[in-house]
Amino acid sequence: MSGGAVGAHDGTLTMLCGGDVRAFEQCRDPLEAVSSTITHLGPLGAGMVGELACNLILGVGRLAIGEAFAMARRAGLDTDTLYETLTTCTADSRQLRALESALLRDEYPVRIFHGIKDLSAAVDSGRAVGQAMPVMSLTRELYQLIDARAGGLSGSDEVIRFLFDT
């Protein structure tokens, strides 16, 4: 599933499911209580691969957004103006918008962070099916480095603080 605690509370989680189609359909009603999107992706295990794909995109994206704004700050750009501009072009994303408070106001909400575990699972799963995972491997290494230097990450937005401070 994707959407975190807020999505669960609001009933807007995205469920990425795998397994027998009949069993999936039998579970649909209870899943609809907490989900706005429920997708059957294939056989048993397919939901986990879908979740790992989501986490891969989020992990890499968070670092890219953080680096972009760290560079902009150091170059003296008005990051409010940059943010407003990026949300009107092809760089716009839900993730960029979700990071607004960290990027513009140095607010880093404490959230459950499973990033390193999830990134490791994505690398391992890719390798298990014969897929090279160079970007994900580097991303995992960066998160591990940030985690070690920061004395632990209390939330996924903490990587932004680290990038701003280095």
Regions found by a protein language model. Give the residues of each.
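Helical "substrate-binding/catalytic lid" subdomain
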Residues: 46-163
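Rossmann-fold dinucleotide-binding core
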Residues: 1-59
